Amino acid sequence: MSQYFTLFRIEPAFDIGTENLEQTYRALAARFHPDKFASASAFEQKQAVMMSSTINDAYRTLKNPIDRAAYLLKTSGIDADAPEHTSFAPDFLMQQMEWRETLMEARAGNNLESLKNLDNEIRAEQEKLFCGLKQSFARQDCDTAAQQVRQGRFLDKLRHEISSAL
């Protein structure tokens, strides 16, 4: 299941070097670009399209820390995104409500400064979460990592909503 890591010749881990990931992606994308197989057989063309799609999926997954963490958990048989794993700690739920309220008020008042401040706050929370994920994986604490992935999904979604409002 660590196919994406194998494809990019990276040891399966949460903490990976994104520079190497980027370089390997460019090399693989160029090598398997479907246009290079324009004069090849239909089978080879189809294989190139499938490989190109896999390369793109792998890159997107490994580049995003939350997607990478979820993928790592799946390699251990844990689906952090499964519907039965949607609970959050009470303090995180309270914080979510506060952030949502701040977002709604900033949108309603078209307050760009509040939106930017909220975005900075969420970005800082994401950085703390990434450090926590690194520690969870180092301790092989998959349950905590799964909870952190769910929190990260929420933070990603909230940042997307903030970006849309800006």
From Swiss-Prot:
Keyword Ligase attributed: no
Coiled-coil annotated residue ranges, if any: none
GO cellular component: iron-sulfur cluster transfer complex
Keyword annotations of the record: Chaperone
InterPro entries linked: DnaJ_domain, HscB, HscB_C_sf, HscB_oligo_C, J_dom_sf
Residue stretches making up the J domain: 3-75
BP term (GO), one: [2Fe-2S] cluster assembly
Any one GO molecular-function label of the UniProt entry: protein-folding chaperone binding
Pfam families from the UniProt entry: DnaJ, HSCB_C
Family per similarity comment: Belongs to the HscB family.
Subunit and interaction comment: Interacts with HscA and stimulates its ATPase activity.
Function in brief: Co-chaperone involved in the maturation of iron-sulfur cluster-containing proteins. Seems to help targeting proteins to be folded toward HscA.
Record-linked NCBIfam families: hscB
Protein name per the record: Co-chaperone protein HscB homolog
